[in-house]
Amino acid sequence: MTSAPQSVNWKRNLFVTWLGCFLTGAAFSLIMPFLPLYVEELGVSGHQSLNMWSGLVFSITFLFSAIAAPFWGSLADRKGRKIMLLRSALGMGIVMVLMGMAQNIWQFLALRALLGLLGGFIPNANALIATQVPRNKSGWALGTLSTGGVSGALIGPLIGGLLADNYGLRPVFFITAAVLFACFVMTWFYVREQFAPVLKKDMLNGRQVFNSLKNPKLILSLFVTTMIIQIATGSIAPILTLYVRELAGDIHNLAFVSGMIASVPGVAALISAPRLGKLGDKIGPERILIAMLALSVLILIPMAFVQTPLQLGILRFLLGATDGALLPAVQTLLIYNCTNQVAGRIFSYNQSFRDVGNVSGPLLGAAVSASYGFRAVFCVTAVVVLFNALYSYWCLQRQPLKAQQRAIQQRQDS
């Protein structure tokens, strides 16, 4: 990978894209607290039907995002990443307005699918920063950038719930659209990119993209790692509140306690991601990745044996601290092992695997808990992460980019 052009102020771009990721993360999570209520308002009734439709409108966005991501990644490699940020923010803003005007569940489902097709602000922001930042600061920069989306996702549900209580459900969609339009304007004026458009006939096809990689098997293993990270995170989500109730018994503030336990991993990730990313720049992101995967296994197993919500909350905080380092480490390794020419597609493929994990994780958690109980979910998830840690270690041991070579490249880029 070549060093970033000197005329591009990557630090300013990092700040602006961090703010954009924060606004995008907040916009997406603003509507999450009342999504089932909006489904009910659109005419769906009955416990079983409400659960089914709520699950559909939630998962269809990730499904269509996984389908569309490679196309947008290819277009980003042809036209540039900034235009993809603008396209995503504007497109999602328009869809949010239409969601606020939906009259039935089928319209809403179609718009949720369209939201997935037009999304992609955060992965394109990752690709933009990864191709501009000096290599010896990649881990810190991508770790810092990841905190933007996490921060937005943490604060979004709180604000969304307050807005829905005070103004109703539909106005929240219009407020969300306004946030996304603000993100569009900010990106338009303040993000800078030097990019020479590539003719379609000069673009590498999918086979050529992988042939151009230093280690295609390593890249594929990193895609799988991204998917399993999301599976591990998502598998716990469907059972968390019920597991807290099993631990705490009948308490009057179950929703508050569950919400706190659901939020603490994000807080931990905010603290750990930049620091572990910076450490990865010194000792290598591959060491951070393997260490955090192994630590995740050691944290997941005790979760199956906790006796109180406090114990679960402490372990969830520790798990969040490890998770905060995983995706930035994967992204840093991706950019170490591909060129700027194909970075957009590599990051988009990674996003597709992430979306597959977002869909399959809750399904795995629900299936395991239905058959074997809540505690079994943590054991199964630990086994999945352990397999991934061993597989990743094997692939990283075979990669051609050794620490000495990386140190030389870092000195050249800095």
Swiss-Prot record:
Matching InterPro entries? MFS, MFS_dom, MFS_MdtG_subfamily, MFS_sugar_transport-like, MFS_trans_sf, Mutidrug-R_MdtG, Tet-R_TetA/multi-R_MdtG-like
The Gene Ontology CC terms held by the record are:
plasma membrane
Which keywords does this Swiss-Prot/TrEMBL entry list? Cell inner membrane, Cell membrane, Membrane, Transmembrane, Transmembrane helix, Transport
From what superkingdom does this record's organism come?
Answer: Bacteria
TM annotation in the entry: 14-34, 56-76, 89-109, 113-133, 144-164, 171-191, 219-239, 254-274, 288-308, 376-396
Any GO molecular function: transmembrane transporter activity
Which NCBIfam families does the record associate with it?
A: PRK09874.1
Listed name of the protein: Multidrug resistance protein MdtG
Q: Which organism is it from?
A: Yersinia enterocolitica serotype O:8 / biotype 1B (strain NCTC 13174 / 8081)
Kindly list the organism's lineage: Bacteria, Pseudomonadati, Pseudomonadota, Gammaproteobacteria, Enterobacterales
